[in-house]
């Protein structure tokens, strides 16, 4: 699977929310594009990632 331009090995298909949490990313504070399409937050628990997917993850950072 390709994540933010880097290839990683996905041991088995998993839900997007599980994947984000395994990378210490809070699903509330990220935007995700999967194979060129934005994934709605309400779908994070039902979307399944597969080895052939391309994922872009953007984290929101507060500041002033």
Model-derived features with residue positions:
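Ubiquitin-like/PB1-type beta-grasp interaction modules and other compact soluble beta-rich domains
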Residues: 1-63
